């Protein structure tokens, strides 16, 4: 399965609860934190929801 590298570059503070939940679901905790997740429709949806807080690359 394909994987993608997701890096948080903006803070999740003072954001909508659903956006904070998406960051938590992706496993992101702080600025410059990077995780490698599988490229599934559910993770794509979480990334699209918080696309202004994260940057995505293929892993």
From Swiss-Prot:
Keywords on record: Ribonucleoprotein, Ribosomal protein
Biological process per Gene Ontology, one example term: translation
InterPro entries referenced in this protein's UniProt entry, alphabetically: Ribo_uL30_ferredoxin-like_sf, Ribosomal_uL30_bac-type, Ribosomal_uL30_CS, Ribosomal_uL30_ferredoxin-like
Pfam hit, one: Ribosomal_L30
GO molecular function: structural constituent of ribosome
Signal sequence region: none
One cellular-component annotation, GO: cytosolic large ribosomal subunit
Database matches in PROSITE patterns: RIBOSOMAL_L30 (PS00634)
Family per record: Belongs to the universal ribosomal protein uL30 family.
Record note on quaternary structure: Part of the 50S ribosomal subunit.
Protein name per the record: Large ribosomal subunit protein uL30
Organism of origin: Psychrobacter arcticus (strain DSM 17307 / VKM B-2377 / 273-4)
